[in-house]
């Protein structure tokens, strides 16, 4: 008999949805939204629904695999674990533990996925990656400005007179905030969307501003310039609660409004209009992630933060520079899981440059890579170098559910469970502040095992099994210790499924910032002044490159896949689609459906052309995440350069050319 059970979405996404999952005869039948969830209210996206397909897919990896003479052969778990443990011990004895690289990302938001750190710390410490492909530049930027990256509670947008959605297509990536926008608009709020692409969110806006890709920070400086010229700044907030304002005044005086308009390709009239909008408090700003995926990405977020501060929209209802909400994740005792004090050795590679660093590593060289919660061959920039690096080492171990592009390179593949086959807690530090409970609903197929089981077995073989003697419930209780006095326990979560975390709904309302000065820092204490930086690949920084490669390439999040996780589950094999601005199609006499080649000095891809109405001139988009085996990863075109603050990617800082294939 079928049962409908509550669960939660594990995907690394803004919304962290509640689920109703239909289970019959130990099989997932259907995934739908939980109407009782306080934020997601029964609505989920196609990516969440496809978790049923993912769980039941006949392509699931069911047994440990070892590559022998270029072909994968099934082996027992004992053989796989014994051989991997032997290699780990030998590598540590001969070269040191940092000859092992742990390459990982956030394919699953389960809180117990952090136990991988406990294993590697117990092993002695390995080469870890730092930074983020996704949002690292912006997180670091807000730490310089505010001391941390905190966002307003979802309902607070309903207090906004004006709402500026800057580079964030919430209709695609944050659907429950999209619902809030519709409600706010019905209540009379004025919605402005700033984006190079005229997307589904722009369609509900009162005003759409098309901006040159990578020039959002310059636009923010221009708006600030007009706010100051018109005398609309919040002088009291600036005087009492900020540091370095005179540096901002000098900065915006260094460019004329005409030059700013030329660089951003936004009219002076629209810049002046935006200045009045920001000064018409309360105005909330909701930033996306794409606008900081440039060399100047951290500075871009800092300039937008500065604009929000100058206009007096910090710490007030209906305001905020909303980028992330790290106070959600900070509510948990993750340190209880990781045992960071156990490691005796340590080395770090940048997540963006990990391929180059693998190839260049000495003292010690990288001898083994273990990949968890990621598909680096598809998702890392400059994928040809990634393939070379991951093919160059002695042993590659991949923990996954499917034969991804990365798994195909592996020496060992360890089949792991889906979220419905293990118990965990789920949250997102991107939007709302609720934690969801996800019970184990069905048994794992074949011999698939949880990540936790794998780490436990390896730890036992390597002599630190005592660090993994706890039950799954005990692990979860460890993470909730800091919340027990607030009534948030594992028992209450199991009973109620979703609980609100005790975070500040209006961050910085007390104007007590976490910076060294205790103030909002226009000029960061340790990192210095704001600058009017531009992307590395632009006509302003590299005119010769821009002449050969005149088009800005964006690689936005796909509608139907969470990065690379869903493409292989489509009923029809996915095909690479090249979306272009109308002027490109007109200049090159192209039409929908034409086969085109997109290239630069790093690589090329081929796909079917689609014309994007109202997209910013000279802009191309190719959704990220498509696998090499389905036609080529767009990351063969992107650069591994780091952002200005060293913690973000430059995936959108990419010039290309395009031609029709005849």
Task: List each language-model region with its residue ranges.
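N-terminal export/assembly segments and adjacent metallocofactor-ligating motifs
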Residues: 1-230, 254, 259, 267-268, ...
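Hydrophobic alpha-helical scaffolding
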Residues: 7, 51, 70-74, 105-109, ...
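Acidic/polar loop patches that form or flank catalytic/metal-binding clefts of enzymes
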Residues: 29, 128, 234-235, 271, ...
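Extended redox/cofactor-interaction regions of prokaryotic respiratory oxidoreductases
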Residues: 114-182, 187-194, 201-203, 217-221, ...
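Glycine/threonine-rich phosphate-binding loop and adjacent beta-strand/alpha-helix elements that clamp
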Residues: 154, 420-444, 454-455, 459, ...
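Flexible glycine/proline-enriched surface loops and loop-helix/loop-strand junctions
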Residues: 163, 204-205, 255-258, 286-291, ...
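Active-site phosphate/pyrophosphate-binding segments
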Residues: 223, 243-354, 497
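Long, contiguous, secondary-structure-rich segments that constitute the structural scaffold
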Residues: 445, 451-496, 569-578, 584-662
């Amino acid at each position: 008999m079928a049962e409908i059970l509550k669960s939660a979405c594990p995907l690394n996404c803004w919304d962290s949805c509640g689920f109703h999952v239909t289970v019959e005869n130990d099989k997932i039948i259907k995934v739908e939204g939980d109407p009782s969830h306080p934020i997601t209210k029964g609505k989920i996206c196609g990516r969440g629904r496809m978790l049923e397909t993912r769980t039941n897919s006949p392509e699931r990896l069911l047994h440990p695999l070892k590559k022998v003479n270029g072909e994968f052969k099934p082996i027992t778990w004992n053989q796989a674990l014994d051989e991997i443990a032997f290699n780990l011990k030998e590598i540590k004895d001969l070269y040191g533990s940092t000859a092992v690289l742990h390459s990982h990302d956030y394919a699953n938001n389960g809180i117990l996925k952090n136990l991988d750190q406990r294993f590697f710390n117990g092993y002695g410490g390995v080469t870890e990656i730092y930074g983020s492909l996704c949002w690292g530049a912006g997180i670091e930027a807000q730490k310089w400005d505010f001391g941390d990256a905190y966002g307003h509670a979802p309902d607070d947008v309903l207090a906004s007179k004006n709402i500026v959605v800057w580079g964030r297509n919430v209709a695609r990536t944050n659907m429950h905030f999209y619902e809030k926008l519709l409600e706010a608009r019905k209540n009379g709020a004025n919605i402005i969307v700033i984006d190079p692409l005229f997307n589904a969110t722009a369609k509900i806006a009162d005003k759409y501003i098309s901006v040159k890709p990578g020039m959002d920070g310059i636009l923010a400086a221009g708006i600030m310039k007009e706010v100051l010229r018109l005398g609309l700044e919040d002088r009291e907030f600036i005087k009492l609660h900020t540091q370095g304002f005179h540096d901002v005044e000098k900065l915006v005086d260094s460019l004329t409004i005409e030059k700013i308009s030329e660089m951003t390709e936004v009219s002076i009239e629209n810049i002046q209009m935006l200045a009045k909008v920001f000064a018409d408090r309360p105005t909330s700003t909701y930033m996306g992630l794409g606008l900081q995926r440039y060399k100047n990405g951290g500075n871009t977020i800092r300039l937008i933060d500065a604009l929000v501060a100058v206009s007096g929209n910090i710490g007030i209802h209906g305001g905020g520079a909303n980028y992330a909400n790290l106070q959600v994740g900070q509510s948990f005792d993750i340190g209880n899981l990781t045992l960071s004090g156990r490691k005796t050795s340590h080395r770090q590679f940048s997540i963006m440059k990990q391929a180059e660093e693998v190839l260049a590593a000495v003292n010690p060289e990288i001898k083994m890579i273990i990949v968890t919660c990621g598909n680096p061959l598809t998702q890392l920039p400059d994928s040809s170098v990634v393939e070379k690096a991951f093919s160059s080492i002695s042993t590659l171990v991949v923990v996954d559910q499917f034969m991804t592009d990365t798994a195909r390179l592996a020496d060992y593949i360890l089949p792991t469970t889906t979220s419905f086959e293990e118990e965990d807690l789920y949250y997102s530090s991107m939007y709302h502040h609720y934690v969801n409970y996800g019970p184990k609903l069905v048994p794992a197929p074949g011999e698939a095992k949880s990540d936790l089981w794998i780490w436990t077995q390896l730890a036992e073989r390597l002599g630190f099994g005592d660090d993994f003697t706890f039950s799954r419930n005990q692990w979860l209780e460890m993470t909730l210790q800091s919340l027990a006095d607030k009534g948030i326990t594992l028992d209450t979560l199991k009973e109620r499924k979703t609980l609100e975390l005790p975070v500040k709904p209006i961050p910085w309302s007390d104007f007590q910032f976490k910076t060294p000065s205790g103030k909002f820092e226009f000029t960061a204490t340790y990192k210095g002044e704001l600058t009017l930086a531009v992307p590395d690949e632009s006509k302003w920084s590299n005119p010769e490159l821009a002449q050969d490669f005149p088009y800005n390439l964006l690689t936005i999040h796909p509608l139907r896949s969470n990065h690379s996780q869903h493409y292989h589950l489509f009923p029809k094999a996915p095909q690479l689609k090249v979306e272009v601005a109308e002027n490109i199609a007109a200049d090159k006499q192209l039409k929908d459906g034409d086969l085109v080649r997109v290239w630069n000095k790093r690589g090329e891809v081929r796909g079917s052309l689609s014309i994007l109405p109202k997209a910013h001139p000279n802009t191309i988009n190719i959704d990220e995440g498509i696998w090499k085996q389905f036609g080529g990863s767009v990351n063969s075109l992107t650069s591994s350069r780091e952002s200005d603050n060293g913690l973000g990617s430059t995936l959108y800082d990419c010039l290309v050319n395009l031609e029709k294939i005849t």
